[in-house]
Regions:
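Canonical Rossmann dinucleotide-binding motif of NAD(H)/NADP(H)-dependent dehydrogenases/reductases
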Residues: 1-4, 268
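Conserved N-terminal Rossmann-fold NAD(P) cofactor-binding segment
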Residues: 4-57, 298-302
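Residue-level recognition of the N-termini of beta-strands and the immediately preceding loop/turn
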Residues: 10-15, 41-45, 99-100, 126-129, ...
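Charged catalytic carboxylate motif
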Residues: 25, 84, 222
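A structured beta-alpha segment of the ubiquitous adenosine-cofactor-binding alpha/beta core
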Residues: 30-59, 65-96
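Redox-cofactor binding/interface segments in oxidoreductases and associated redox assembly factors
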Residues: 61-62, 103
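Rossmann-like NAD(P)(H) cofactor-binding subdomain of soluble oxidoreductases
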Residues: 73-142
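C-terminal substrate-binding/catalytic lobe of Rossmann-fold NAD(P)-dependent dehydrogenases
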Residues: 121-130, 136-305
Length: 305
C-alpha cells in the first residue's frame, strides 16, 4: 500500500477475506488502513466469500488457518486446516492469470500443497505457489549478525531447508558475511551446528512463551520481504529461501512443497539454486525434515486426489 513493493505508480485494490463471525472486527482493520492515508489504495474489499476475495487478484496471501489448540497433535491440526485450503485452492480459479500465491497459515508447507493441488485443477500452474520460510531466514540472519557483531544486511546466502517447523534446517555453513563464509567469520562450528539451529527452530515457540501470542509483526514483515523478492531480481551471487514445489532437486520428492534456496531472474521466473554443497551433517538434517513433510502429505492424502 505504501509503494515499497510494487512501485510508487502502482495502484492497489486490497481484498480481505475473513470468517463470518470476525467481519465486524475486520471493519476496524479497514478503518486503520484508511487512517494510514496510503496514497495508492484505490479500494478495500472485505468479504467472507473466497471466490469474491480472490476475484482478479495478482497476489494472494493465505494467512488464515486454525491455530493449534492445547493437547492437539500436529496431525490433528493438519486435518483441521486441510479442508480450508481445499476451498481456497478451488476459489483461486477466479484470480488473475498471473496470480502468485504465498501460504503463511500453518502448517504452511502442507497447506500450500493442498491449495496447489486444487488450484492446478483450475488451471493455475504449481510454480505460482510458495509457502513462507522467509521468517525463518530472517531469524537466522539476525542470529548470525548478532553472533558476528555485524549488520543484518551483511549476512547473505542463508538457506532454510525443508519444512516450516521445528525440523527445518537453517543452513549457515553455506551462508556468507561480507562475502566470507560464515564458519570462517564466526569460528565456532559447535555453535553453528547446535545453539544456532536450535534457536531458529524454536524461535516461534519462544515468541509465544514471551508474549502469549504467535509472531505477528515479524511474520507480516517476512511476507512483505517474500513478495518484494519475488517481484524483483535477486542480487548476483545471493539467494533467498522459499518453500516451493520440488522439481526433484537435491533428491527431494517431486511436487513436495519444500524450502530451498531460490533466485528470481527478473522475468518472473523462480528457480531453485543448484550446486549448493551439502555435507553429511546437512544431509541428515534434510532427511529428517523431508520425512516429516512426507508424513504430513500422507495425513492429507485424501485431499490430494
Amino acid at each position: 500500500a505504501s509503494g515499497e513493493i510494487f512501485g510508487h505508480d502502482t495502484r492497489i485494490s486490497l481484498h480481505l477475506l475473513e470468517i463470518t463471525p470476525a467481519l465486524k472486527a475486520l471493519e476496524g482493520v479497514v478503518m486503520e488502513i484508511e487512517d494510514c492515508a496510503f496514497p495508492l489504495v484505490d479500494e478495500v474489499v472485505i468479504t467472507d466469500r473466497a471466490e469474491e476475495a480472490f476475484d482478479g487478484v495478482n497476489w494472494a496471501l493465505l494467512v488464515g488457518s486454525k491455530p493449534r489448540g492445547k493437547g492437539m497433535e500436529r496431525g490433528d491440526l493438519i486435518r483441521e486446516n486441510g479442508p480450508i485450503f481445499v476451498g481456497q485452492g478451488k476459489a483461486l480459479g477466479k484470480a488473475a492469470e498471473d496470480v502468485r500465491i504465498l501460504v503463511v497459515g500453518n502448517p504452511a508447507n502442507t497447506n500450500c500443497l493442498i491449495a496447489m493441488h486444487q488450484a492446478e485443477k483450475e488451471g493455475i500452474p504449481r510454480e505460482r505457489f510458495a509457502a513462507m520460510t522467509r521468517l525463518d531466514q530472517n531469524r537466522a540472519q539476525a542470529q548470525l549478525a548478532q553472533k558476528a557483531g555485524v549488520e543484518v544486511g551483511d549476512v547473505t546466502n542463508v538457506t532454510i531447508w525443508g519444512n516450516h517447523s521445528a525440523t527445518q534446517y537453517p543452513d549457515a555453513e553455506n551462508a556468507r558475511i561480507n562475502g566470507r563464509p560464515v564458519p570462517e567469520v564466526v569460528g565456532d562450528m559447535g555453535w553453528l551446528r547446535g545453539e544456532f539451529i536450535d534457536t531458529v527452530q524454536q524461535r516461534g515457540a519462544a515468541v509465544i512463551a514471551a508474549r502469549g501470542l504467535s509472531s505477528a509483526a515479524s511474520a507480516a514483515n517476512a511476507a512483505l520481504d517474500h513478495v518484494m523478492s519475488m517481484e524483483g531480481t535477486t542480487p548476483e551471487g545471493d539467494w533467498f529461501s522459499a518453500a516451493v514445489p520440488s522439481d526433484g532437486s537435491y533428491g527431494i520428492e517431486e511436487g513436495l512443497v519444500f524450502s530451498f534456496p531460490v533466485r528470481i531472474d527478473g522475468q518472473g521466473g523462480c528457480g531453485i539454486v543448484q550446486g549448493v554443497e551439502l555435507g553429511d551433517f546437512a544431509l541428515e538434517k534434510i532427511a529428517a525434515t523431508t520425512a516429516e513433510l512426507q508424513e504430513e502429505k500422507a495425513v492429507v492424502a485424501e485431499l490430494l486426489k
